[in-house]
């Protein structure tokens, strides 16, 4: 019997793959997402699916927005996926494919896919994905799966997420169609939106602080340049005066 990997094992693997330091504000985001992915990966009932992939990719992109240097985000995401035995390219490709599928489906088709026992016209692919989840008695629900479904709905019908009443009605239909806990999913998504808002506020404060620091640094550099210029002018003036004095003294000696 193989030994179940621990959170420590996964974190160690992650930091082996990604060796650059991570900004302290974002380190908690990365580690919390990594732990969540790890716990699912070692759960016997968990099965990877495109909605989960979309949830992972969306969470990472939304919470890591504003990370610097931007190039490090690629390494961080790849290392997270590698640490749990996953493939970053597969996550991104499956997430992108699901987004494209969402854009091809109308709001009516979405609703019918979650309500009907047969696929509605033009939505066979989506219906099959939903049906596979609904018929899985051991389906492992997760917050990341919920975020994936939420993102999918938003890509198909953005106004669904802007109107609280319509959003709740749609989530009721979705959870019923997937045989998932409605209240749990709604609470998870409420927390997701709340955390996003808090993160955006933190980033705004950070950007303001960086702007102030940048202005202070630019002012200091400008003042330093001005002082250097003044010193240069003063030196040149003194040199000219010395030359004139020497010339005058030479003339007197003559």
Swiss-Prot record:
Region ranges (Disordered): 215-254
Organism in which the protein naturally occurs: Picosynechococcus sp. (strain ATCC 27264 / PCC 7002 / PR-6) (Agmenellum quadruplicatum)
Transmembrane intervals: none
Coiled-coil annotated residue ranges, if any: 182-241
PANTHER family: PROTEIN THYLAKOID FORMATION 1, CHLOROPLASTIC (PTHR34793:SF1)
Keywords on record: Coiled coil
One Gene Ontology term, aspect cellular component: plasma membrane-derived thylakoid photosystem II
A GO BP annotation: photosystem II assembly
Function, in words: May be involved in photosynthetic membrane biogenesis.
Domain of life, source organism: Bacteria
InterPro entries: Thf1
Pfam families attached to this UniProt entry: ThylakoidFormat (PF11264)
Name of protein: Protein Thf1
Organismal lineage: Bacteria, Bacillati, Cyanobacteriota, Cyanophyceae, Oscillatoriophycideae
